[in-house]
Amino acid sequence: SGGFGKLPADRDSMEYTIMTYHSYVGSSATATYTNQVWSYPQSLMPYDIAALQHMYGANYGANRGNTVYSWSPTTGELFVNGVGQGAPGGNHIFMTVWDGGGVDGYDLSAYAGGVRIDLQPGGWVVAAEAQLARLSLDGVHLASGNIASALLHDGDPRALIENAIGGSGDDVIVGNVGGNLLLGGAGRD
């Protein structure tokens, strides 16, 4: 009672949880993981965070101030308020951002191509297709995005990312229920 139940088949992959046996939706659970090298999650994913919050509550002290998240197009390194967090291998970005409060933003202004930013809880950011995780050895199955926005715990909007800055290409930016500031930059956004 009060549990999550079985994970829906269309969410049973590393894109949503590291507690899966599937590299991508529809992959075999009897075989080993099929991700290419450097294409594994770099953080807990949205449903992992939701499960922990269900059991222990949400940590709204994590990055509770005004926080800007940005990534390097050449290395994939995450920067939090301009401070590098270490570059991932292979220039792939595959993570979820949980933020405890403040007025926060994704800054993808360093990207020359068009980016897709969905600020809705569980939404995906695609900074660059070249930086997407390859979830199959043949490279056919790509992650849905580079960065997932965490789900809201009990509908609490403190975890929303409110702002987004796109790249210099043709961007698509989707806001959320927060007071969003959405800047497309150059290009036809």
What annotation goes with each model-predicted range?
Residues 101, 110-112, 121, 165-170, ...:
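Extracellular, beta-strand-rich repeat scaffolds characterized by small/acidic residue-biased motifs
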Residues 15, 45-51, 157:
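Stable alpha-helical elements in mature extracytoplasmic
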Residues 2-12, 22-31, 54-82, 103-145:
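GD-rich hexapeptide-repeat beta-solenoids
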Residues 10-13, 88-89, 97-101:
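Extracellular/periplasmic catalytic domains that process cell-envelope and extracellular macromolecules
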Residues 43, 88-89, 152-158, 164-166, ...:
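Low-complexity, polar/charged sequence tracts that form flexible coils or short amphipathic helices
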Residues 34-42, 83-85, 90-93, 147-150:
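Active-site rim elements
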Residues 18, 96, 105, 116, ...:
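Discrete beta-strand positions within long extracellular beta-solenoid architectures
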Residues 14, 100-101, 156, 177:
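Parallel beta-helix/beta-solenoid
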